[in-house]
Amino acid sequence: MNCLEQQLNTTLFIRTNRGVQLTPEGERLYTHVLSAMEQFQAAEEELADSSGLSHGSVAIGASETALNIFLLDKLKNFHMTDPGIRLKLYNHSTPEAIESVKSGKIDFAVVSTPAEVDSPLKQIMLMPFQEILVGGTTFTALGSQELSLREVKNYPMISLGRETMTYKYYNSVFLSHGLDLSPDTEAATADQILPLVKCELGLAFLPQPMAAPSLLKKEIVQIPLKDEIPERQICLVYDSQHPMGAAARELKNTSVAGRV
């Protein structure tokens, strides 16, 4: 390592009695080396077994919405068919997942739109989904009405945080009607929204498949809207220039084959 530091004419580690710590230059080098090593490992695993499916691993980044309404069933079927494959699942927002695809940390991402994807990354639409407005049981009376987005603004709102693509998406929907999205409660993850709705903290937009079980149990109520909320998509994002192992290719192809 000393030789490498001399060749690069820079310090990569700060050495102390407690161990070593990467310098900013070392962090940058580590990021590039990590991506190369993961690609090398994927190639090594593929070559070690011509079938590629008796062992190996697949690294996937998934948003919670994509995981809950699309990916879980695909992972279950894949694991039953190929139990020797190790699955590495990362909980990412859409931007985080796309960045991980770019850096080579994951084989591909399954996320919800909108997704900003630039070449050489490619995007495959897998499944459309509709989001609905829901509230807790104290809002039951609204279930027999039909609200405009302007009227929705009169009630407390729950949404994901402002740094998420979902927030930006709904902010653009409200702006298209001359309104500003100003939620009273911001959740860190999509899975937090439904419990917050049940606790009567406000109204929220949820994917219909995620809301359906609670609607059937009458734990929440759907509130009809006068204004149309555009359909969104679950999509798969991958790097067309990044080599995938056989297992990752198989899971990717299985996911694409199962698109709606």
Locate each region found by the language model.
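A late-sequence structural motif
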Residues: F70, V221-V260
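Alpha-helical linker/hinge and terminal dimerization helices associated
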Residues: Q7-L8, L29-S51
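Hydrophobic hinge/microswitch elements
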Residues: S93-I98, K102-K105, S112, T166-I223
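Short loop->beta-strand "edge-of-pocket" segments that line small-molecule binding or catalytic clefts
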Residues: A59-G61, E131, L147-Y167, R259
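Central regulatory/effector-binding core of bacterial HTH transcription factors
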Residues: H55-V117, A187
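Secondary-structure junction motif
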Residues: A141-L142, P156-H177, M244-A248, K252
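Flexible hinge/capping segments at coil-to-helix
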Residues: S51, P120-M157
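A short LG(V/I)-centered, amphipathic sequence patch enriched
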Residues: E5-L22
